[in-house]
From Swiss-Prot:
UniProt-listed Enzyme Commission number(s): 2.4.1.202
Keywords: Glycosyltransferase, Transferase
InterPro entries for the chain: UDP_glucos_trans, UDP_glycos_trans_CS
Protein name, per record: DIMBOA UDP-glucosyltransferase BX8
Binding site residues for UDP-alpha-D-glucose: 141, 340, 342, 357, 360-362, 365, 381-382
Source organism: Zea mays (Maize)
Keyword Transferase belongs to the record: yes
Catalysed reaction equations from the record: DIMBOA + UDP-alpha-D-glucose = DIMBOA beta-D-glucoside + UDP + H(+); DIBOA + UDP-alpha-D-glucose = DIBOA beta-D-glucoside + UDP + H(+)
Pfam families in UniProt: UDPGT (PF00201)
Cofactor(s) listed: Mg(2+); Ca(2+)
CC terms in the record's Gene Ontology section: cytoplasm
Length: 459
């Protein structure tokens, strides 16, 4: 454990599961190195459970009220903008109260506040902390390459790369190799100008932060991290994989679906590297037709699988029953769960492939466990992640087409797991990447984490 100089870090995760988990995992890594933690969190259904965390954590609810119908929508730009607008004043009030308590009764407050550590999506939080004279560190839970897209987004819109047009989708983006136009970050469900404005605010707040922390492998994204460091002129740290740097621990929000651990017992009875794990994360959704195609693609492939069908995965339906005829085809070789302990599933020796939406957390976890991927990005940064996985690192294969189709699904599974030369090459490269990731934990990520603790203790 690193020596602590006393005081605490105020940690404020963004209330989406894919953002929340890495920030809380990072907080646990800092805590293990002697840093006191106070968690600010949105109140209500998206609050963390204190029982899941060390006894000396402190939890401070921040009332953030956004219309439920907006939160239930897929308009990411509007949701994030509304959350920031609703959060700024109550966050400032609670941080001010904590600062006053720390000045008056350090025992009650747990020591003085050294800094705020928050998701870069909370641009209002970064600005409010700075306004109160508190150093603020931003955490990027996506890749460094995605942050580089954030930085260039307004230019990409102004130059006509976005919105994506059919006739240009395969064109190279000269300003951002290795991206093609169709790989660029985007959300079809929100207004492009509003999204560009949001990213502009995120970058502006990040430039004025006291430092940026990326959940990424330093050895994979070294060049991109260097470009960001030079352009932003703030300290930059890379800490990944957090699932290897920090002991396994629960990090979840009230109201999230609990993981079904029964699938692990089922995996125990399967042959090594024979099972395909299928999960599209905590937010991606698909149309009912695609769900049917995916079910039949898995059935037709004839390979054992664990499939996560979470509530609200299928647009317009709260849950998903297998289509008629599929259950009989997959009985005994397919397990469907509402949620899975993903890190443990990917680490299981029976798992030989991961059919994924290519969210960044899932990508990091797959690389850290050496599990090759079948990629079908759905929105946001997933297109760019798939570009790196399949065409730069070459540790995965893509399902052809914009919509899931059973024949293309079966073909992708056969390419990866059917003993082909392509599949063997993918597995070999993924194993090499895993070895490099394991080596980099101590050499790079661990040292960046140590340097981050030193920075925090210097405040």
């Amino acid at each position: 454990m690193a020596a602590s100089c006393g005081g605490r870090v105020v940690v404020f995760p963004f209330p989406f599961q894919g953002h929340f988990n890495p920030v809380m995992r990072l907080a646990r890594a800092l805590h293990a190195r002697g840093v006191g933690i106070t968690v600010f969190h949105t109140a209500g259904a998206r609050a963390p459970d204190p029982a899941d965390y060390p006894a000396d954590y402190r939890f401070v609810p921040v009332p953030v009220e956004v219309a439920p119908e907006l939160m239930a929508s897929e308009d990411i730009a509007a949701i994030v903008t509304a959350l920031n607008a609703a959060c700024e004043a109550p966050f400032r009030d609670r941080l001010s109260a904590l600062l006053s308590a720390a000045d008056g009764e350090a025992g009650e407050a747990g020591g003085r506040v050294r800094c705020v550590l928050t998701d870069v999506s909370w641009d209002a939080v970064l600005s409010a902390a700075r306004g109160l004279g508190v150093p603020a560190l931003g955490v990027m839970t996506a890749s460094a390459a995605t942050f580089r897209v954030y930085m260039a987004y307004r230019t990409l819109v102004d130059k006509g790369y976005l919105p994506v047009r059919e006739e240009r989708k395969d064109d190279a983006v000269a300003e951002l190799p290795p991206y093609r136009v169709k790989d660029l970050l985007r959300h079809e469900t929100c207004d492009l100008e509003e999204f560009a404005d949001l990213l502009g605010r995120v970058i502006a707040a990040a430039r004025l932060s006291s430092g940026l922390i990326f959940h990424t492998f330093p050895f994979i994204e070294a060049g991109t991290l260097g470009e960001i460091r030079d352009d932003m002129s703030v300290p930059v740290y890379a800490v990944a994989p957090l699932n290897k740097l920090v002991p396994a621990a629960t990090a979840s929000l009230h109201g999230e679906v609990q993981a079904d651990r029964g699938c692990l017992r089922w995996l125990d009875a399967q042959r090594a590297r024979s099972v395909l794990y299928v999960s599209f994360g905590s937010m991606a959704a698909m149309d009912p037709h695609e769900f049917v195609e995916l079910a039949w693609g898995l059935a037709d492939a004839g390979r054992p699988f664990v499939w996560v069908v979470r509530p609200n995965l299928i647009r317009g339906f709260e849950s998903g029953a297998l289509p008629d005829g599929v259950e009989d085809r997959v009985r005994g070789r397919g397990v469907v769960v509402s949620w899975a302990p993903q890190e443990e599933v990917l680490a299981h020796p029976a798992v030989g492939g991961f059919f994924t939406h290519c969210g960044w957390n899932s990508t990091v976890e797959a690389v850290s466990e050496g599990v090759p991927m079948i990629c079908h990005p759905r929105h946001g940064d997933q297109y760019g992640n798939a570009r790196y996985v399949c065409h730069v690192w070459k540790v995965g294969t893509e399902v052809a087409g914009d919509q899931l189709e059973r024949g293309e699904i079966k073909a992708a599974i056969d390419r990866l797991m059917g003993g082909s030369e392509e599949g063997e090459g993918i597995r070999k490269r993924m194993n090499e990447l895993k070895i490099a990731a394991d080596k980099g934990i101590d050499e790079s990520a661990g040292s960046d984490l140590t340097n981050l603790v030193h920075l925090i203790n210097s405040y």
